[in-house]
A protein has these predicted regions:
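Helix-loop boundary and gating motifs at the non-cytosolic
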Residues: 1-54
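Transmembrane alpha-helix termini and helix-breaking/packing motifs in multi-pass membrane transporters
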Residues: 35, 63, 68, 99-100, ...
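Glycine-rich segments within core transmembrane alpha-helices of 12-TM secondary carriers
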Residues: 50-56, 87, 145-174, 197-198
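Paired intracellular helix-loop junctions of major facilitator superfamily
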Residues: 126, 136-144
Length: 201
């Protein structure tokens, strides 16, 4: 019995994109909340904690729901495709709202950003558990430990890929030049690249 490495890597692409997304979320969203929308650390911290609160309910619910789902494309893929599609659309709205707020601040835009961010977290929650459960579905039980190692490796690759992208787009010298000129960092290219990774994955 031999592990199908190619299939396991393909399955792991979803986890790669999830890890790349969360790296961006944890690093960039707090900066947007505090620097663009001028929220204090308490409010931004509460917003950033929302993903953990939602995960308590969404992950077991959609994991269980996918267990009971049967379609032509399998148990997990409907959730992965739907969640990824919604997440791609919603995450690209965030920098648009941020840029619009920077040009003309308003409370409505702040509220819109928070609402879209919440919907994005829900979208991510719909397919996180199904994506993780996909590997055991297609891997014989004796080989699942090896399969899990590959999945975790793919997640690490997603994190490394994100760091490589940010080191190119937002190098320290470039950030210092923007700050010296009194400008603002535009994160839209980063959101677009991460969403492209999610689309391809």
């Amino acid at each position: 019995m031999k592990l199908n490495n190619r299939r396991t890597i393909l399955v792991g692409l979803a986890f790669l994109s999830i890890c790349a997304f969360w790296q961006m979320y944890d690093n960039i969203v707090p900066l947007i909340l505090t620097r663009t929308f001028h929220m204090n650390e308490t409010i931004s911290g509460l917003i950033m904690a929302a993903d953990n609160i939602l995960a308590l309910f969404l992950l077991p619910f959609f994991g269980s729901l996918s267990d009971r789902t049967n379609t032509k494309i399998g148990k997990r893929m409907p959730f992965i495709l739907f969640g990824t599609g919604c997440a791609i659309i919603l995450m690209n709205l965030l920098p648009l709202i941020e840029n619009s707020y920077y040009a003309a601040p308003s409370t409505a835009k702040t509220v819109s950003f928070v609402i879209v961010l919440g919907l994005l977290l829900i979208a991510m929650g719909t397919y996180r558990s199904p994506a993780v459960a996909l590997m055991p579905d297609v891997t014989p039980k004796p080989l699942r430990s090896k399969g899990n190692a590959i999945i975790n490796l793919m997640g690490a690759v997603g994190g490394i890929l994100y760091l490589a992208i940010t080191s190119v787009l937002y190098s320290q010298s470039r950030l210092e030049a923007i700050e010296a000129a009194g400008g603002r960092v535009n994160y839209q290219p980063l959101f677009m690249i991460v969403s492209a990774i999610m689309f391809v994955s």
